[in-house]
Amino acid sequence: MTDTTPNSAPEEPEITYEAARDELVEIVTRLESGGISLAETMTLWERGEKLADICQSWLNGARARIEAARSDAETAQP
């Protein structure tokens, strides 16, 4: 069975897809609203990149599981 947990840096706690997506939406909203310093913008952007990677890992894992299930179903049919 394939592990579907995202690969993250050791200091990053595991986070669900939904939590990562929700936090990413909040970050994008803050960045789009403006009025924050360059340093804070860069910090938010870096966090957003990490969250986007986590979301992509979850989606890749889900895609692999679906493809495996389809393959199993196709080989099981007479």
UniProtKB/Swiss-Prot annotation:
Alphabetized Gene3D superfamilies for the sequence: Exonuclease VII, small subunit
Enzyme superclass (EC): hydrolase
Reactions mediated catalytically: Exonucleolytic cleavage in either 5'- to 3'- or 3'- to 5'-direction to yield nucleoside 5'-phosphates
EC number: 3.1.11.6
Localization per record: Cytoplasm
One of the record's GO molecular function terms: exodeoxyribonuclease VII activity
Record bears the keyword Hydrolase: yes
Protein's GO biological process: DNA catabolic process
Family to which this protein belongs: Belongs to the XseB family.
Subunit structure: Heterooligomer composed of large and small subunits.
Protein name as it appears in the record: Exodeoxyribonuclease 7 small subunit
Species of origin: Cutibacterium acnes (strain DSM 16379 / KPA171202) (Propionibacterium acnes)
